[in-house]
Design a protein with these regions (language model features):
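Charge-rich, low-complexity N-terminal segments
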Residues: 1-117
Length: 117
């Protein structure tokens, strides 16, 4: 029998942004901020040590990326000039080759997923 394992860890950061590609009367056209939450998922076979990846090792990969965005204007970050939740999830996925999926929450009710195919 073959079993696939996934682990997910949640991270948080606060940042401001505006969406330059929306209509002028759209509320997100103006600068505003979010308390973002991201979930990083890793899918892989179980290793001999009982882990897919140790959460501590995952933190060493993700924390520096979160630090690049925390308390920043996301529009100023290369690759996030149009910082939709979709683009933010893609930004993380492109920088975390080990991740199988990234989920970015702008609010508790609104999120976007980027999934490696």
């Amino acid at each position: 029998m073959s079993i696939k394992f996934s682990v997910t860890r949640r991270y948080t950061f606060e940042a401001g942004h505006f969406l330059p590609m929306v209509a002028d009367d759209h509320k997100c056209k103006r600068q505003h901020g979010h308390n973002y939450e991201i979930e990083v998922t890793v899918t892989a076979p179980l290793r001999d040590n009982g882990f897919i990846i140790d959460f501590w090792d995952l933190d060493k990969l993700v924390d520096p990326l979160v630090a690049q965005l925390d308390h920043r204007n996301l529009n100023d970050i290369k690759g996030l000039e149009n910082p939709t939740a979709e683009h933010i999830s893609m930004w993380f996925l492109l920088r975390l080759p080990i991740a199988s999926a990234i989920r970015v929450f702008e609010t508790k009710d609104c999120w976007a997923d980027a999934v490696r195919t």
